[in-house]
Amino acid sequence: MNDLKLLRSKLSTETIEELYKNLNLLKKELFNLRFQQALGDLKNTSRFSLVKKSIARIKTELTKRANSEEY
């Protein structure tokens, strides 16, 4: 639970460029995980959910910032 709070505070302090950079890295990792799964080489399947949730958290932070700039 503390890791989640740390991640949220880290996301709120990162710049938009850093968030997009991390988002692209996570998308590449997700692609590689899917590729490994297709080949049958994937050992840690729980990594899928962690990467997907991290992507969602970053997208949520970006949306929150975009909405706050509109008002």
UniProtKB/Swiss-Prot annotation:
GO molecular function terms noted in the UniProt entry: structural constituent of ribosome
Keyword Phosphoprotein: no
Record GO cellular component, one term: cytosolic large ribosomal subunit
InterPro entries on file: Ribosomal_protein_uL29, Ribosomal_uL29, Ribosomal_uL29_CS, Ribosomal_uL29_sf
Pfam families: Ribosomal_L29 (PF00831)
GO BP: translation
Xref: SUPFAM superfamilies: Ribosomal protein L29 (L29p)
Keyword Acyltransferase included in the entry's annotation: no
Keywords of this entry: Ribonucleoprotein, Ribosomal protein
Family: Belongs to the universal ribosomal protein uL29 family.
Listed HAMAP family: Ribosomal_uL29 (MF_00374)
Name of the protein described by the UniProt record: Large ribosomal subunit protein uL29
Gene: rpmC
